[in-house]
Amino acid sequence: MIDINELRADPDTYRASQTARGADAGLVDRILEADSRRRSAITDFESLRAEQNAFGKKVARAQGEEKQQLLAQVKQLAADVKAAQAAADEAQATQQQLVTQFPNLIVEGIPAGGEDDFVQLRTEGTPRDFAAEGFEPRDHLELGELLDGIDMERGAKVSGSRFYFLKRDVARLETALLMAAQDLALDNGFIPMTTPNLVRPGIMNGTGFDVEHDDEIYRVGKDDLYLVGTSEVALAGYHSDEILDLSGGPLRYAGWSSCYRREAGSAGKDTRGIIRVHQFNKLEMFVYCHPEDAAAEHERLLAWEEQMLQACGLAYRVIDTAAGDLGTSAARKFDCEAWIPTQGKYRELTSTSNCTTYQARRLNIRERLPETTDAHGKVKKGGTRAVATLNGTLATTRWLVALLETHQQADGSVTVPELLRPYLRGQEVLRPVA
């Protein structure tokens, strides 16, 4: 949630943010109008309450006919106070509804526009030249079927389209990938977590997902719970309504979970294989930190993602996502896209988002500010403020697409990156099953 005080002080910056996103800049003015009505309604209520309190003292001193007249006025005043309270509550609810709709304020300098308006920051690694090696690369599904490791047909039979079974070495490769990612996170101070796959609507909304209008979210109607599309949701909710101690540095969590997405708007896209599916596994980094440290922490998350990609021997590029392609909560997002040989293009494997204080405000997650001492030596207890939250993908099932295609050999076997071999009992090659 945005800071209404900041919007009130600098509405033009918020209008510019909305314009860059391709969103409704007029929402700024509707919020300001609602805010003005709210403050006016509160002033009216407080004025009437003060008058009511003053009347109470007059009634106590009055006698006879005067007292009866005052009591009649008190009765009317009580009704006026009640009506003013209702008007103030309604104005507050209207303002809150509008503020809740407003996406995060983008970081200054990120590209404006939509999905195709990103800025490429750099490329790393060189895509393999299969023509020079003398063979045509197979796609990940063909390789997976040769390894008897991906079964889309039975996935569809059991659960429908965009579901699958992973088997044998491919299933082990996925687990190895996630375990290697978890170890990298552990080495960098993350606390490992397994998280709930179902969350309450308040947590889903608090993270920035609109449960009423988001067609990507699976809902369990009887229990009013939602399947998460990322462990970010559960990890953001983990400290909801809490005051955190960040004096020792950022709180970093690495969440391992299954993820669920309806892919409602993806008809006809990536229908072959496991690039775009309804269920997958992911190792997600999630951080709580001081707001002033968020930009530097964002760069660290990106560096860890790149470290993982490089250790897996994948060629990739880093892009600065355009404002119109950001999620509601993100102020800035970097994507790492790996080269997919059979598609001849880069595809997203990781993303990392700086959500500034947006999620923390919605979920009431704060930190205690340090004590201060005034000129007279009097110690004043520190107040509280919203923390910053960030997230980033360290590994996910989709990585198998890039791993299988990048490291394939002419006979259909796949060389295992050195990073993953210890998690596969030293196995160096995945071989086709006869």
UniProtKB/Swiss-Prot annotation:
Binding site for L-serine: 230-232, 284, 393
Primary location: cytoplasm
Reactions it catalyzes: tRNA(Ser) + L-serine + ATP = L-seryl-tRNA(Ser) + AMP + diphosphate + H(+); tRNA(Sec) + L-serine + ATP = L-seryl-tRNA(Sec) + AMP + diphosphate + H(+)
EC number of the protein: 6.1.1.11
Pathway: Aminoacyl-tRNA biosynthesis; selenocysteinyl-tRNA(Sec) biosynthesis; L-seryl-tRNA(Sec) from L-serine and tRNA(Sec): step 1/1
Keywords: Aminoacyl-tRNA synthetase, ATP-binding, Cytoplasm, Ligase, Nucleotide-binding, Protein biosynthesis
GO molecular function per UniProt: ATP binding; serine-tRNA ligase activity
GO BP field: selenocysteine biosynthetic process; seryl-tRNA aminoacylation
Stored InterPro entries: aa-tRNA-synt_IIb, aa-tRNA-synth_II, aa-tRNA-synth_II/BPL/LPL, Ser-tRNA-ligase_type_1, Ser-tRNA-synth_1_N, SerRS_1_N_sf, SerRS_core, tRNA-bd_arm
Lineage: superkingdom: Bacteria
One matching Pfam family: Seryl_tRNA_N
Binding site for ATP: 261-263, 277, 348-351
Signal peptide start-end: none
Subcellular location, record wording: Cytoplasm
Annotated GO CC locations: cytoplasm
PROSITE patterns noted in UniProt: AA_TRNA_LIGASE_II
Record note on quaternary structure: Homodimer. The tRNA molecule binds across the dimer.
Function of the protein: Catalyzes the attachment of serine to tRNA(Ser). Is also able to aminoacylate tRNA(Sec) with serine, to form the misacylated tRNA L-seryl-tRNA(Sec), which will be further converted into selenocysteinyl-tRNA(Sec).
Domain notes: Consists of two distinct domains, a catalytic core and a N-terminal extension that is involved in tRNA binding.
PANTHER family the UniProt entry points to: SERYL-TRNA SYNTHETASE
Family: Belongs to the class-II aminoacyl-tRNA synthetase family. Type-1 seryl-tRNA synthetase subfamily.
Protein name: Serine--tRNA ligase
Organism: Kocuria rhizophila (strain ATCC 9341 / DSM 348 / NBRC 103217 / DC2201)
Lineage of the organism: Bacteria, Bacillati, Actinomycetota, Actinomycetes, Micrococcales
